[in-house]
Amino acid sequence: MRVIGLMSGTSYDAIDAAAADIRIDGDTLVLTPLGMVSEPYSGELRAAVAAAVPPASTTVGQICQLDTEIGQAFAAVAARANAELCGGSAELISSHGQTMFHWVEGAQVKGTLQLGQPAWIAEKTGCTVVSDLRSRDVATGGQGAPLVSAFDVLWLNGRTSGSVALNLGGIANVTAPGGGGTTADGPAVPIAFDTGPANALIDAAVSEFTAGEQWFDLGGALGAAGTPNVDLLAHLLSEPYYTQPAPKSTGKELFHRDYLLAALRGYESLSLADIVATLTALTARTVADSVKALAATEVVVSGGGTKNPTLMAMLRDELGDIALVSSDELGVTSDIKEALAFAVLGFLTAHGLPGSIASCTGARHASVLGSLTPGSRGLPRITSVPSAPKTMRIEAL
């Protein structure tokens, strides 16, 4: 099946579309990436999203407008991907949408909201669309995240038991297919969770203190020019989220601009470079602490944070003897991974197969994820699959 996965992360800077041919061979999911296209949000739409996410207030009218405009933007990127990557032959589109809010009370996720009305995608492309992929997991008591864990477990099964997948987006998340070791009863079940901010607080600081002229630390230049402040870092590390047990999830409903400004009270004399260096060190430390707790021997990293050499250098230092490997070395380009993961989730849904792993999200059971919006071409043709795949093989074109 030829599938397009659509993704925009918590940095809400661009929409990524990855296309792939996906099939099942025995107990193996065979994935052949076809490429990726990416389209930045317009300045107006990005500003509108930023103005609506917590802790800002918004209106039902603004949410309706955003749902439509994000859906139209996703539809345009999907149509481009279908034309440029698939020659117009895509059979299914799987859209994550744009996360606006993750409703968490204590350790329990009570709801999640992704905007980007799928009807616009179906109308523009003629393809059936799988969307709203997180809500079913939440309804079964799960965190609704990290959903990429299903991809990671399939992908890394068969490597060393200490392999851990790490994604550095706005939020950092890890997946340990081996569950961090073995138990007295045998192999441990997979686990996954959000470790905390990756780029979220760095981006917030850069945007705030450059009056919006910059959105992120380009090339890690600010972080490299500064020195982490030991006292501020200790203060940031006192955040209770970091000591919560897994599975757990978080987002910009916690790690946002106002959170950052409150944390910086008493540190007004610090330069922007020192602030960014400290926030970069925070990401490296919290990720490394989480990885070490999983008894990892290898970290396979992907996501936008890999483009920040300062962050990557700090992370290497924090990891010590634990190997840090780019996902590119395993056949999955870092930029494409999340969109590919959602293509796989859409494929699983279309075949009636679970896309969540209960031990990774904390759900009562695994679930078939998402909702279907049929396209004008009708539902995709489905080949009967006797059982869910256990591993994944990446094949080149």
From Swiss-Prot:
One of its GO terms (molecular function) is phosphotransferase activity, alcohol group as acceptor. It catalyses: 1,6-anhydro-N-acetyl-beta-muramate + ATP + H2O = N-acetyl-D-muramate 6-phosphate + ADP + H(+). Its EC number is 2.7.1.170. The keyword Transferase applies. Keywords: ATP-binding, Carbohydrate metabolism, Kinase, Nucleotide-binding, Transferase. ATP binds at G9, T10, S11, Y12, D13, A14, I15, D16. InterPro entries: Anhydro_N_Ac-Mur_kinase, ATPase_NBD. SUPFAM superfamilies: Actin-like ATPase domain. It comes from the Bacteria. GO terms for biological process: 1,6-anhydro-N-acetyl-beta-muramic acid catabolic process; amino sugar metabolic process; peptidoglycan turnover. The keyword ATP-binding applies. It is an enzyme of class 2 (transferase). Pathway: Amino-sugar metabolism; 1,6-anhydro-N-acetylmuramate degradation; Cell wall biogenesis; peptidoglycan recycling. Belongs to the anhydro-N-acetylmuramic acid kinase family. Catalyzes the specific phosphorylation of 1,6-anhydro-N-acetylmuramic acid (anhMurNAc) with the simultaneous cleavage of the 1,6-anhydro ring, generating MurNAc-6-P. Is required for the utilization of anhMurNAc either imported from the medium or derived from its own cell wall murein, and thus plays a role in cell wall recycling. PANTHER family: ANHYDRO-N-ACETYLMURAMIC ACID KINASE (PTHR30605:SF0). HAMAP family: AnhMurNAc_kinase (MF_01270). This is Anhydro-N-acetylmuramic acid kinase. It comes from Rhodococcus erythropolis (strain PR4 / NBRC 100887). The gene is anmK.
